[in-house]
Amino acid sequence: MGFLVMIREVSMAKAIRVVLLCVSVLWVVPKECACRSNFSRNSSSSSSSSLRPLRQRPSSVNVGALFTYDSFIGRAAKPAVKAAMDDVNADQSVLKGIKLNIIFQDSNCSGFIGTMGALQLMENKVVAAIGPQSSGIAHMISYVANELHVPLLSFGATDPTLSSLQFPYFLRTTQNDYFQMHAIADFLSYSGWRQVIAIFVDDECGRNGISVLGDVLAKKRSRISYKAAITPGADSSSIRDLLVSVNLMESRVFVVHVNPDSGLNVFSVAKSLGMMASGYVWIATDWLPTAMDSMEHVDSDTMDLLQGVVAFRHYTIESSVKRQFMARWKNLRPNDGFNSYAMYAYDSVWLVARALDVFFRENNNITFSNDPNLHKTNGSTIQLSALSVFNEGEKFMKIILGMNHTGVTGPIQFDSDRNRVNPAYEVLNLEGTAPRTVGYWSNHSGLSVVHPETLYSRPPNTSTANQRLKGIIYPGEVTKPPRGWVFPNNGKPLRIGVPNRVSYTDYVSKDKNPPGVRGYCIDVFEAAIELLPYPVPRTYILYGDGKRNPSYDNLVNEVVADNFDVAVGDITIVTNRTRYVDFTQPFIESGLVVVAPVKEAKSSPWSFLKPFTIEMWAVTGGFFLFVGAMVWILEHRFNQEFRGPPRRQLITIFWFSFSTMFFSHRENTVSSLGRFVLIIWLFVVLIINSSYTASLTSILTIRQLTSRIEGIDSLVTSNEPIGVQDGTFARNYLINELNILPSRIVPLKDEEQYLSALQRGPNAGGVAAIVDELPYIEVLLTNSNCKFRTVGQEFTRTGWGFAFQRDSPLAVDMSTAILQLSEEGELEKIHRKWLNYKHECSMQISNSEDSQLSLKSFWGLFLICGITCFMALTVFFWRVFWQYQRLLPESADEERAGEVSEPSRSGRGSRAPSFKELIKVVDKREAEIKEILKQKSSKKLKSTQSAAGTSQSQHGEIT
């Protein structure tokens, strides 16, 4: 007897027992081990089938189909499945004489009825089941498929938690919502929206899909600010209450993930609430294109509801097979539209048929056996013995997973996670009278304006810079992406935490007048708030007891704990705080400096040496001697003042060199080269003298202050107490970053304690120095009568900002407003209003060593002078060698005469007179050289004339 007949025969009490026992059968988790062992036994027995003789094929094979007939998906799936069955049976190349028989069951949108329908299908010994369309029903009947080893191919269950590990016989032939949520996250990131509100149906598909979206957004530093769940089958009143509540929140970006049969009601209610106007962003998952595609014609009223909505639709590759199927659809369902789930259902049937064809060609047979687990339910009135295990189910499932062919939806192939390969979505913008394609998404290339299949041949590239979409028109006919958020209209003001300071109250402090606080930081915040394009109701809340400065780290933690929406004050932007809150653009520069007592430096008898560094003195002195030697070489042959005994010439070189320092040299330069070198050198001396005079004047006239502490390095190594301000980050920085012992750090309450601790010093219970931020020190030094100064350099660089909760959009708008205040000069005006301090003395000690003139300031002058000397020396020696060459014949005759008188002289000795002659030529006066050359030329002329006369006389005698 059939299953339904059995239910009709029992009484009402027995019917209740039937339901309970059915559910117990479905959720038999403890029986999993037995199922596994039975699975292995059946698979091992079937593995030997290849060794057996060829089996006779059955005349027909039963396949189940389970979905809701009266639904957008079901109305498209049923004719598609029937058409696929007819096509398979008509195709002689597939199954070859075996009739494919599909048994239909209506789940009627009910998990219970769907489960009953699945059990009825199993009674008919089906080898596979196609469906269901609902993820919730798929979860339930997957347990049945696991127990009976029947592959379950769903063309509509997109829930990403339907895992192959939990349900090894479940296979999704459509796209996984895991990829759709990645596509939506990429679109949100592309548009710059960091907070969204998710509106979803409260079932497995809705909850789990939105959960995946939240995880993906978290990786992109975005988040779902609120999850608004809709009860399945909710009426308009419930939806209205939900939308009214989310409309009071700050986010204006809504992701709608509901069922296609009731989803349009969400937009109808939103339209009536004015939530489809400019400033709103609506993003719908594939349910909306499914609903619209299922309509033969989308009427104008429906399109009016959806103006500006962005939707994602399953992308299927355009092909001739797809076009033929779409043309055929008009004959199958002339009054209904065509959606993607019809194609997935059609391909699912063909997938089963092709897998069966491979199954039979491998000489496998279809056999069923009783499940021993079902016989343990003694006393049950349900005929569970009618349910049989498909013995070859595991092998058949492996064949299905290994299939690789092309269907109506494109290539049908599965990856290691049993998902369709190359998932892709079409991005639609609903505007005007029909949806418009603005781009595509795939896990291979992200957002793109070209078809995904054209990019598969290229390397994967999902970088942010590679993302592209066409222009989108948002609700209200807005072409620019909306900001995506507004200040929440829930009647709650912005909670602003303000430190209740007791020191440096010009920055921030308590005030008796509204709004209860005052100071530089408050004025900056108020000025920035006024620049925002929307009103921000706010209330200031003091933090601290008013006796000591509060801990700023604790104040930031209050923002993290949602006790404050923002912390406003002199809050330093440091790395540790940025991990938990979002800071605005800094509105004032800051950094840690060291303040120490100073005293006037004693005058030194060697102060005249301080203008130059040691290297500068050495190079300058060397150049004085070098230039003096160069001038002596160039003038020695021309100028009598540079000639004489060696002692006199050496004195002349030193005297001339250093007398040029004061431009008082009495020796005149005669040669052109000497004058050229001297002019360049006097210019260098002029620059050096002027710089020396200016530097020495500064050193002797400006008050010189000294301190035992020279900067943060000497302070760290001194082992003396260090003062810090209560509540600031300076203490943690010194301990954690500079490894200073906590016992050395002395917290100070206010300016009076600062000055008192510095005056007493470390030996009298005070401190050696204070480490604090520069803005505070500027105020402190105005009241110190120049007794204290900053020493060393600022050793951190940071600023003050306002601390907002993580991912708060208000932080971005406030940063923009602060930049605008800076560009317009308003920040400077506020600074002058509160912090216009005039310092009678310099804040920092001027170190004489830092003001010394070094060689790097003058090396260019010395280089020019050196090049000039080298050029002059080159020209000089070239002239000397030229003159020597002209005197060379006379010297050669004398050398040969010497060789006759001293035949035993060596080769080295024979070359010596030439060098001596060269030295003699260099040492001779220029006038003497010219006279010798003149005489030599005259002798040569006379000898030429004598030779000519002798030649003429000889010619006469011959004649």
Swiss-Prot record:
Enumerate the Cytoplasmic topological stretches. 635-643, 665-675, 879-959
Q: Which residues form the signal peptide?
A: 1-35
Q: Where is this region: Disordered?
A: 893-913, 936-959
**Primary location group:** membrane
* Record keyword Ribonucleoprotein present: no
State a single Gene Ontology molecular function: ligand-gated monoatomic ion channel activity
How does this protein sit in the membrane?
A: Multi-pass membrane protein
Q: Where is carbohydrate linked to this protein?
A: N38, N42, N108, N365, N378, N404, N443, N461, N576
What are the Low complexity biased-composition ranges? Answer: 943-959
InterPro entries cross-referenced by the UniProt entry: ANF_lig-bd_rcpt, GABAb_receptor_plant_PBP1, Glu/Gly-bd, Ionotropic_Glu_rcpt, Iontro_rcpt_C, Iontropic_Glu_rcpt_pln, Peripla_BP_I
Q: Name the protein family.
A: Belongs to the glutamate-gated ion channel (TC 1.A.10.1) family.
Its job? Glutamate-gated receptor that probably acts as a non-selective cation channel, at least in hypocotyls. Can be triggered by Asn, Ser, Gly and, to a lower extent, Ala, Cys and Glu. May be involved in light-signal transduction and calcium homeostasis via the regulation of calcium influx into cells. Plays an important role in the calcium-based fast transmission of environmental stress. Acts as a negative regulator of lateral root initiation and development. May restrict primordia numbers and position along the root axis by a signaling process originating in the phloem.
User: Subunit arrangement?
Assistant: Forms a heteromeric channel with GLR3.2.
Q: What is this protein called?
A: Glutamate receptor 3.4
